[in-house]
Each structure stands twice: as C-alpha cells, then as structure tokens.
Amino acid sequence: YERTGKIAFEVGAFTNIGEDHISPIEHPTLEDYFASKLKIFSQRRFAVVNLDMDKVDRVLEAASRCERTVTFSLTDERADVLALAIRNGDCGVVATVRTPRFTRDIVIPTPVKFNVSNALAAIACAEALGISEEGIVHGFEGVFVPGRMELYPSVSGKILGIVDFAHN
C-alpha cells in the first residue's frame, strides 16, 4: 500500500469510496481500503474533498492536516466548488459552476452526471493551485477519455451503444 509513499503531491483529491477494490489481491476490507486512501493527505499540500460521499466527516478530518482544503459538490451549498445547474448541451453536459473566484457555465464533454462530479473535482484541484478561470475552462475543451462513456449511435439514431470500461 505504499505505491506512492515517496511522492510529494501538490494536491490530493478524494472523490469517493466504494467496494470496487475489495478483493484478495487488493484490499481485504472496505475499512482497509478507506484507511489506505486517506494516506493521500499525508503526502500533499492541498486537499480536495467531495462533500457528496459517504464518510465525508472522516475524510475532512484527515484532510485538515493539509495547508488548504477545497471542497466540491453537486448539491451541498457549503462546497467551495458547486454545480448550481446541470443540463444537456450539444457537446456534452453544461454545468453552471460556482467557485470562490467565479460563477460560469462550463462545458464538460462527457454525457453523464458522475462525470460532472469528476469535473468539479478537477476544477477544485485547479482552484487549489490558483489556475486562472480561463485556464480551467480551456482545460475542458476537447477532453476525451478513451473507454469512458463513449457513445456510438446507430446510423438511424434508434440505437445507442455505450462503451465504459475505463474505470481506473
């Protein structure tokens, strides 16, 4: 569990916790996995935390040793980075995002809500690092992750295939 033990990160982001890595070859229990994930905050300067996840109080406690914590959420008004509105657009999802420095629409070129949460995490990381508003917006232009919610409509448009295997 010390795969990144010698790396000093500027930002450590904790997006969620689930049972997807519980197995004989990874983590034997959810608690073991959770404790392992919390270690990221001992190797970082800034913490980014999703207020929408389970066990958020424990995550915030672990993040408190960081120089600064930036939070994000799809729904929690207390978040530093918040999606005020989410709607479908021509090129993906359009989220009206509020940060400590700006409020504006950002096009997220992936078609599902959980990717909005991932985008908010990226925006929170950029916020922690002081990246400009334009730099953040520009960073989403042309984003494409192979194998992550790739849509393949049939010629008729009546059938939609979805490829989504890029979990980790």
Where are these regions (language model features)?
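Short, glycine-rich nucleotide/cofactor-binding loops
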Residues: 161-168
